Each structure stands twice: as structure tokens, then as C-alpha cells.
């Protein structure tokens, strides 16, 4: 067991190192390298994630046993890497909104109250023209960070777009059944 604990700690340490290098690249506006490093960190963490292993005994690899501290560190590192990956993808040209949305959902599955993930899920939904979803995520973000100007701005943009969309839909249906 001690040998396995050491291997787990080494894996977490390596993933943390990739994440730190990714953070450095992010602050230096080297988004492509940052994305690559966050991916490497997540790949490193995959080997520890029990949810990815087969529930059938004897089929596929067996799950690694983590102590509570390691499990918490795994969860935090995964959430941080997905959140940072979403931030990079949001700043890429052109922004990759579908991937931002997917990464944000990964964070929210691990940390449902994460304001940055709620905001990014809302922003990406807005740009994907899914205004109902955008409103849902941005409202949650606004309730947790009521003074954040970016969140307020996107809530207003979303409300306007949602209102326009509903009005156009109403006009369309009136024309059909008029």
C-alpha cells in the first residue's frame, strides 16, 4: 500500500507541476502551450480517477485506492485544470465556445458552486445562442458574486437576447396560426 501511495503522490505532483507550468504560460499569454500543459495534467490525473475504471471485476484496469487527502487533491487539480483550460479556450482566436462549455461542466460536476465555471458556462452558452442555459448559469454566478461587473454585463446581454428571441418566436407562431 505504501508503494501505491507513493506512486499516487508522484502522479499528483507531476500533474500539479504541469498545471503550474500552464499557469505560467497563461500569464505570459502563451495560450497554446498553456492548453497543452493543462491537457497533460489532466491526462496524468486520468490514471487516478476511479470513475473511469470498469465496475466489472477482472475487466480492464482496477481503480487506484486514494486516501481522503489524495482524493480531495485529485478533485481540486481536475477542477483547476478544466477551469484554466476553459479560460484559455475563451481567449483563443476564435474562441472555442463549445469546448469552454464542456470544460465548465466538468468543473461544475466537481465543484457545483464554482463562480468562474458558472460564468464561463453562461458566457459560452450565450455565444452558442442557448440563451435559456446562459440565463441559468449566469443567474447562479450573479447570486454568488453580485458585484462582478462582467457577470452583470452578460446577464443583461442574455436577458436582452432572451427577450428578443421570445418576441421573434411569438411573431413566428402568430404567423403560423394567425
UniProtKB/Swiss-Prot annotation:
Gene3D superfamilies named in the record: Tetratricopeptide repeat domain
Cited SUPFAM superfamilies: TPR-like
Originating species: Xenopus tropicalis
TPR repeat boundaries on the chain: 15-48, 79-114, 115-148
Protein name: Tetratricopeptide repeat protein 9C
Gene: ttc9c
UniProt entry keywords in alphabetical sequence: Repeat, TPR repeat
Record-stated family: Belongs to the TTC9 family.
Residues that span the membrane, as ranges: none
Source superkingdom: Eukaryota
